[in-house]
């Protein structure tokens, strides 16, 4: 199985999920065939799986625009990155307050073709 360079890619920015949670789900489908990955993500019950599946479907649509055969595609890379972080205040007893971080993420999916 020889692998060529990256054929197509798709991405999504500022998604309301932490990079840590997305990375757990991305590990399930990294370096897998596209057909296997879509089934895995469809039956995974985590919210992050739905977010990654949308980006993967976008990358598959980009591959179809180039006339590539979907059966020969695999996920070469899934990059999960940090995006912006909103800081919020959570009031505590005796006039104190804690800071709460609302984290956002970026996803990039790169597909390669199996020759």
Swiss-Prot record:
Keyword Lipid biosynthesis part of the UniProt annotation = no
Keyword list, A-Z: Ribonucleoprotein, Ribosomal protein, RNA-binding, rRNA-binding
Extract one GO BP annotation from the record: translation
Gene that encodes it: rplV
Pfam families for the chain = Ribosomal_L22
Q: Which domain of life is it from?
A: Bacteria
What is the recorded function of this protein according to its Swiss-Prot or TrEMBL entry? This protein binds specifically to 23S rRNA; its binding is stimulated by other ribosomal proteins, e.g. L4, L17, and L20. It is important during the early stages of 50S assembly. It makes multiple contacts with different domains of the 23S rRNA in the assembled 50S subunit and ribosome.
Database matches in NCBIfam families: rplV_bact
Concerning its family, UniProt says:
Belongs to the universal ribosomal protein uL22 family.
Q: What is this protein called?
A: Large ribosomal subunit protein uL22
One annotated Gene Ontology cellular component of this protein = cytosolic large ribosomal subunit
Provide the assembly information.
Part of the 50S ribosomal subunit.
Q: Which GO terms describe its molecular function?
A: rRNA binding; structural constituent of ribosome
Query: What high-level taxonomic lineage is stated for the organism?
Result: Bacteria, Pseudomonadati, Pseudomonadota, Alphaproteobacteria, Rickettsiales
- Name the InterPro entries on file: Ribosomal_uL22, Ribosomal_uL22_bac/chlpt-type, Ribosomal_uL22_bac/org-type, Ribosomal_uL22_sf
């Amino acid at each position: 199985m020889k692998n060529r360079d990256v054929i197509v890619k798709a991405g999504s920015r500022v998604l309301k999920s932490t990079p840590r949670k997305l990375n757990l789900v991305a590990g399930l489908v990294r370096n897998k065939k596209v057909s296997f990955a879509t089934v895995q993500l469809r039956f995974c019950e985590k919210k992050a799986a739905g977010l990654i599946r949308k980006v993967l479907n976008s990358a598959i649509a980009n591959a179809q625009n180039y006339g590539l055969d979907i059966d020969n595609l695999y996920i070469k890379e899934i990059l999960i990155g940090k995006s912006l972080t909103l800081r919020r205040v959570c009031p505590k007893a005796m006039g104190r307050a804690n800071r709460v971080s609302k984290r956002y993420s970026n996803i990039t999916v790169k597909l390669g073709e199996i020759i």
